[in-house]
């Protein structure tokens, strides 16, 4: 266990960030799943812009790596174009 006040505070703040990051990542994963299950091209195209925005926000906050974000966006764009 931590012995310093600053270390105890860091433990508390890390837990708060972990929960928030986990929520944002899970929400984005659910949106990606919904996009992949979409069968209508216009519906999927509408969802694509919001999903790409969510992915960019995760990458900006270093929740996911920049390259993973690029790969996801590329694959999802190809998927929507193929519909």
Curated annotation (Swiss-Prot):
Entry keyword set: Ribonucleoprotein, Ribosomal protein, RNA-binding, rRNA-binding
Keyword match Disulfide bond: no
Any one cellular-component term (Gene Ontology): small ribosomal subunit
GO molecular function: small ribosomal subunit rRNA binding; structural constituent of ribosome
One of the GO biological process terms: translation
Pfam families: Ribosomal_S20p (PF01649)
Top-level taxonomic group: Bacteria
Family matches, as InterPro entries: Ribosomal_bS20 (IPR002583), Ribosomal_bS20_sf (IPR036510)
Family: Belongs to the bacterial ribosomal protein bS20 family.
Functional summary from the UniProt entry: Binds directly to 16S ribosomal RNA.
Protein name: Small ribosomal subunit protein bS20
Origin species: Flavobacterium johnsoniae (strain ATCC 17061 / DSM 2064 / JCM 8514 / BCRC 14874 / CCUG 350202 / NBRC 14942 / NCIMB 11054 / UW101) (Cytophaga johnsonae)
Native organism taxonomy: Bacteria, Pseudomonadati, Bacteroidota, Flavobacteriia, Flavobacteriales
